[in-house]
A protein has these predicted regions:
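Alpha-helical interface subdomain recognition
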Residues: 1-89, 101-106, 113-118, 131-134, ...
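Short Ser/Thr-interspersed hydrophobic loop/turn segments at strand-loop and sheet-helix junctions
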Residues: 49, 73-77, 169-171, 188-193, ...
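Flexible, small-/acidic-enriched active-site or ligand-binding loops
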Residues: 136, 191-222
Length: 402
C-alpha cells in the first residue's frame, strides 16, 4: 500500500493551490459580503484544466485520476467553498455522470465542452418538495415524437443561473408501481425556450457562489439527450451523487485544514495573561482534534478515490468520507471561531466565513441523516449494490491521457 503522491499529483495540487491562494483569496471576502459569484472564477478554472481534471484527454479533459480530483477539491475549499461547489456540480454531478452513462455521441457533444470549460454544467435534482426523497420528485417529461416535453421546477441548484447545461432527473412514468423506476435523466440546454432560472439570496453561507432555481414550461428536449434508458433516471442520479459526494468530502477536508492553519497561526500570536494561548491546554485540545480530524478525513477520501481509480462502486466509502468530513469541518469551524474569540465573530477573519460555509455540506448531496441510513444498511446487510448497466469508469493512465 503506497500512500505517497506522484509528481503529477503534486503538480495538480500546486496548480489548484496557486489559483485559489493567489487569484481567489485576495477577492473572495468582498464577493462574499456582496453575495455575488466571483465573475472570473469559472473561466479561469476552465483555462487551467481544473474543470476537466479527471476527464480523459480525448473528451477535452486533463486525463488525471480521481485522486487528483480530490486533491483539487481540497485545495479549492481551503480558500472558499464556492470553488469546490462548482467542481461538485459541474464536474461531479454533470461531467463524470456523462462519462459513466453517456453514449459516445453524447460525450462528443456535451462532455467535451464541459471538460474544456467552454460550457458550464450543473445537476438539477432537488425540488421544492423533494430533496432526500429523490423518487418523490414531481417534475415530469412526456414523449412527443422524437422529443420529450419537460415541465416542473428544481430548487437549490448550484450554478443554476450560470450553467449552460443541466443534468435533470424527471418522472417519465408516473404510473410505475415503483416510483424510482419511473424516472429518467436528460441533458437539458438551459437556453431553450421555456426554461427560466433565478438566484436565491440571503443564504447562510457559500455567498460567493450562485445557488438558484430552474423552471421548465413545455421545454422540448430531444430524445437523443436522454442519459441512459427510460426508467434509469434514479440509477443515473445515484451515480451522480456518488461522484458529487466524493468532491464534497475532499473539499470539506480542505476546510478542516484551513480552520486548523488559521487556529494555529492565531493561537501562537494571541496572548492571555502574558502567554500565547497556544500554551493553554484547552486550546491545544481543540487544535489537536482538528489535526486528527483532518488526517482521518483525508484518508477516507483517498480511499474512495483509490476505489474510483479501480472502477469499483464506492457508495459506502464516499458516504463514510462525506459524513465524517462535513461534520468534522463544521466542528472545526465552530472551534476555530471559539479560538479567535470576538474576532472570530467578525468577518475580519476568515473563520467566520468558514463556519457559515461549512453548514451547507451536512445537508446537501445527501444529509448526514441520509448517510447514516446508507451506512446502517450496509452494516446490517439490507443494502446491496446491484450491478449497473453502466459501471463507473476505471482510470487507465495510458488510455485517459492519449
Amino acid at each position: 500500500m503506497d500512500f505517497s503522491l506522484s509528481p503529477e499529483h503534486e503538480m495538480t495540487r500546486k496548480v489548484a493551490r496557486d489559483f485559489a491562494q493567489k487569484e481567489i483569496a485576495p477577492v473572495v471576502k468582498e464577493y462574499d459580503r456582496r453575495q455575488e459569484p466571483i465573475p472570473f472564477a469559472l473561466a479561469r478554472m476552465g483555462e487551467l484544466g481544473i474543470l476537466g481534471i479527471s476527464i480523459p484527454v480525448r473528451y477535452g479533459g486533463a486525463g488525471m485520476d480521481f485522486i487528483s480530483l480530490g486533491l483539487v477539491c481540497e485545495e479549492l475549499e481551503a480558500v472558499d467553498t464556492s470553488l469546490r461547489v462548482a467542481m461538485s456540480v459541474h464536474t461531479g454531478l454533470c461531467s463524470l455522470t456523462l462519462l459513466q452513462w453517456g453514449t459516445e455521441e453524447q460525450k462528443r457533444e456535451f462532455l467535451v465542452p464541459l471538460a474544456k470549460g467552454t460550457r458550464i454544467g450543473c445537476g438539477a435534482f432537488t425540488e421544492p418538495g423533494a430533496g432526500s426523497d429523490v423518487a418523490a420528485m414531481a417534475a415530469s417529461a412526456k414523449r412527443s415524437g422524437d422529443c420529450y416535453v419537460l415541465n416542473g421546477e428544481k430548487m437549490w441548484i448550484s450554478l443554476a443561473s450560470k450553467a449552460d447545461l443541466a443534468l435533470v432527473a424527471v418522472k417519465t412514468n408516473p404510473a410505475s408501481p415503483k416510483p424510482s423506476e419511473g424516472l429518467s435523466a436528460f441533458i437539458v440546454d438551459l437556453r431553450s425556450d421555456g426554461v427560466k432560472t433565478g438566484d436565491i439570496k440571503g443564504k447562510l453561507g457559500v455567498r460567493a457562489g450562485a445557488t438558484g432555481w430552474i423552471s421548465f414550461t413545455d421545454v422540448k428536449v430531444p430524445a437523443a439527450n436522454r442519459i441512459g434508458e427510460e426508467g434509469e433516471g434514479f440509477k443515473v442520479t445515484m451515480s451522480a451523487f456518488d461522484h458529487g459526494r466524493y468532491t464534497v468530502a475532499s473539499g470539506a477536508t480542505g476546510l478542516i485544514r484551513a480552520c486548523l492553519e488559521a487556529s494555529v497561526s492565531y493561537a501562537k500570536t494571541r496572548k492571555t495573561f502574558g502567554k500565547p494561548i497556544a500554551e493553554r491546554q484547552l486550546i491545544q485540545e481543540k487544535i489537536a482534534k482538528m489535526s486528527q480530524d483532518y488526517q482521518i478525513a483525508r484518508l477516507l477520501y483517498l480511499q474512495a478515490g483509490w476505489l474510483k481509480n479501480l472502477g469499483k462502486r464506492c457508495t459506502r466509502e464516499t458516504s463514510y468520507a462525506k459524513k465524517f468530513a462535513t461534520e468534522a469541518s463544521f466542528s472545526a469551524a465552530a472551534e476555530a471561531v471559539q479560538i479567535h474569540g470576538a474576532y472570530g465573530f467578525s468577518d475580519e477573519y476568515d473563520v467566520e466565513r468558514y463556519l457559515r460555509n461549512s453548514k451547507g455540506a451536512v445537508i446537501y448531496e445527501g444529509s448526514s441523516e441520509v448517510q447514516t441510513l446508507i451506512q446502517a444498511g450496509y452494516a446490517l446487510g439490507t443494502r446491496v449494490d446491484k450491478p449497473l448497466r453502466c459501471e463507473p469508469p476505471a482510470y487507465d493512465e495510458k488510455e485517459w491521457q492519449a
